[in-house]
A protein has these predicted regions:
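Short His-centered aromatic/hydrophobic patch
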Residues: 90-96, 118
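A conserved, positively charged/aromatic
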Residues: 104, 108-142, 154
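Acidic donor-binding loop of glycosyltransferase active sites
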Residues: 275-289, 302
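Short hydrophobic beta-strand element within catalytic cores of glycosyltransferases
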Residues: 39, 303-306
Length: 377
C-alpha cells in the first residue's frame, strides 16, 4: 500500500467562489483518503469549514500584489521542507509564482511535485504563463485546454489534464422540488412572482459581462410574442453595484417588463430557486472556462438556455443540446426560449461531472505525478 501524501494547496483567500470551493472539495477528499491536507491563503470565512473537515490552514497572504510578497518565497520553501510536502498545488497566478519560485530553489531530487490548475481563460502573457509551469497542469474543461494550446503553442500538451469541476448529486438531486413553505416565503419576498407565469433565472454577480441586459430583453421579446414570463436576476444586487442595478431597472421599465423582473442579492438557496424555474439562463457575453451554474441546473433536471461559446457551450452540447444558441441573435434566443417553455423539455439524469469523479481524478493525478520520474523545469 502506498504511503499517505502531504499536499499543500495555494490560493489567495478562502472567502467564496469556484476556486475556493474546489480547494475545499479536494481538501475533504484528501483527508477522507488518509492523506494530510494543508491550505495556504490569507484566510476568509471558509477557513472554519476547512479545519472542521480535518485540514490545516496556514495563514500567509500569498495573493497580495506587492513586491513585498517576494519575502514569502523563503517562508514557503521552508514550509515545504519542514512539513515534508509531497505535492504543491497552485490554484491562482500570484500564489503560483510564489510557490514556483520557492519550489524551483529546492533540490530537484527531493523537492515536492508541482501542480497547477487553470481555472479561467486568463489574459495571455508572461504573468499568466506561470500556470503552465506545473509538472501537471489541470484544465477545468476542454475549452480551457484548447485555449492554453492556442495561446501558448509551445506548451507541453502531455502535461495537460482535463479534470472538469464536479457537482455533488446529493446536493443537486435530479427532480428536486423545494417545499411549499419555501416557495410561499420566496413569493412573499418578491410579489412579482405571484402570477402563474413561468420563472426564468439568471444566476450571477452584478457584472455587465453576465448577460443581465440580454435576459431582460429576452423577457420583453417573449411578452411581445404573447408568452409571459418572470425573470429572477439572482445575485445581481451587490454592494457597489447600485448604479448598475438602477440601469437594469430602467431598461426593464423602458421595455415594458418592469413588473416581470426581480433582482436579488446573493442567496444561499440557489438550488431551490433554480429548481423552481422553467429555464435557467447563462448569457455571459464572454466565453467562460466552465460555468458551474449550468451543471448544477442540469443535475437538477432544469433546462438551461445559454450561448454556445466557451465552457458553457461545451457543457450544453454534451448534456442538453437544445439549450445551446449562437450569441448575438436575440430573435433566435427568444424563439428557442419559447420552444423550450412550450415543449417543457427536461434534461435527463446523467452520471458524468460528479464531484466524486473530480476528486478521484485529482487524487489519482497526485499519485501518478508522485511516482513519475523527476526532471528540471
Amino acid at each position: 500500500m502506498s504511503r499517505p501524501l502531504t499536499v499543500v494547496q495555494l490560493l489567495p483567500a478562502l472567502d467564496s467562489g469556484g476556486v475556493e470551493r474546489g480547494t475545499l472539495e479536494i481538501a475533504r477528499a484528501l483527508v477522507a483518503a488518509g492523506h494530510r491536507s494543508l491550505v495556504v491563503s490569507a484566510g476568509g470565512r471558509l477557513v472554519d469549514a476547512l479545519t472542521r473537515e480535518g485540514s490545516e490552514h496556514i495563514a500567509l497572504d500569498v495573493g497580495r500584489k506587492s513586491l513585498a510578497s517576494l519575502w514569502l518565497v523563503p517562508k514557503l520553501r521552508r514550509l515545504f521542507a519542514e512539513r515534508g510536502v509531497d505535492i504543491v498545488h497552485a490554484r491562482s497566478r500570484l500564489p503560483a509564482w510564489l510557490g514556483f519560485l520557492a519550489w524551483r530553489g529546492m533540490d530537484v531530487a527531493t523537492r515536492p511535485r508541482f501542480v497547477t490548475t487553470v481555472h479561467g481563460l486568463n489574459s495571455v502573457g508572461f504573468y499568466s504563463a506561470v500556470m503552465l509551469r506545473g509538472e501537471r497542469v489541470i484544465c477545468v474543461s476542454q475549452t480551457v485546454r484548447d485555449y492554453v494550446l492556442r495561446h501558448y503553442p509551445d506548451s507541453d500538451a502531455s502535461r495537460l489534464r482535463v479534470i472538469a469541476r464536479g457537482v455533488d448529486p446529493l446536493e443537486f438531486p435530479h427532480g428536486h422540488r423545494p417545499d411549499r413553505d419555501w416557495r410561499k416565503r420566496f413569493v412573499a419576498e418578491h410579489p412579482a412572482l405571484s402570477t402563474p407565469a413561468p420563472w426564468l433565472c439568471l444566476v450571477g454577480r452584478g457584472s455587465r459581462i453576465k448577460g443581465h441586459r440580454h435576459a431582460i430583453e429576452l423577457v420583453a421579446d417573449l411578452r411581445h410574442q404573447g408568452s409571459d414570463a418572470r425573470l429572477i436576476l439572482l445575485g445581481v444586487r451587490e454592494p457597489g453595484r447600485e448604479r448598475y442595478v438602477d440601469e437594469l431597472r430602467r431598461l426593464a421599465q423602458r421595455l415594458g417588463v418592469g413588473d416581470a423582473v426581480v433582482m436579488t442579492a446573493p442567496r444561499r438557496d440557489v438550488r431551490d430557486v433554480m429548481a423552481s424555474c422553467r429555464l435557467v439562463l447563462q448569457l455571459s457575453s464572454q466565453p467562460e472556462a466552465f460555468g458551474r451554474t449550468v451543471l448544477e441546473a442540469l443535475h437538477l433536471g432544469v433546462p438551461v438556455l445559454g450561448y454556445d461559446i466557451g465552457g458553457v457551450g461545451e457543457q450544453l452540447r454534451a448534456l442538453f443540446a437544445p439549450g445551446a444558441v449562437a450569441p448575438g441573435d436575440p430573435a433566435a434566443l427568444a424563439e428557442r426560449a419559447r420552444v423550450l417553455l412550450q415543449q417543457d423539455l427536461r434534461p435527463p439524469p446523467f452520471s458524468s461531472h460528479g464531484l466524486a469523479q473530480m476528486q478521484e481524478a485529482t487524487l489519482s493525478l497526485y499519485r501518478e505525478l508522485q511516482e513519475a520520474p523527476r526532471r528540471c523545469i
